[in-house]
């Protein structure tokens, strides 16, 4: 339902490809405590995507991958914070959903490519016979780092039409074609976490409370108090209320 995926579809249609639009249904807003509209799985976003698909004369489908998203993204996200690790759920979503489950659907439906609105580029090295994942031209929007897990087989069947464009060019194309989402804001936060408050999300999602406790060094000295283990990660220095020379 975003402007980037919409323009990616437009560019592929203009190249003469037969395209279909797809939205991955990953969760119900109420299941993850979201109340706002225009999340990636809201009805509004589905309707935006459907509108663009209609304008481009493409069939459009919604695939329900909620069970896999819960297991491979949300549950892993929660477990990471519970163990003091900083997760990146966007990497897991790409790895297990977009380029696994959606990739499987591409094969089943006899299409040749999964096309997304990611800002990244794919090149083929004739000398090594390998596909290369490269940064986008727009370095401010580059997303190649969240695509590191793509295999050679996946890279062979993936296209990123926006990799050679600036974001302003993408919006201009969307406006020129009167796309309903041409001025839609870019998503900044984790899609299933409201207002960026991951700790509140984890407590709501798990039904657990993570009580405050002591910061203790390796010698058993109490250095201060923390506000609950999920609010901190290994190596963190800022926001601890403790002045130390090293993490």
Predicted regions span which residues?
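AMP-forming adenylation/ATP pyrophosphatase catalytic core
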Residues: 115-247
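ATP-dependent adenylation/nucleotidyltransferase module used to activate substrates
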Residues: 1-148, 159, 169, 175
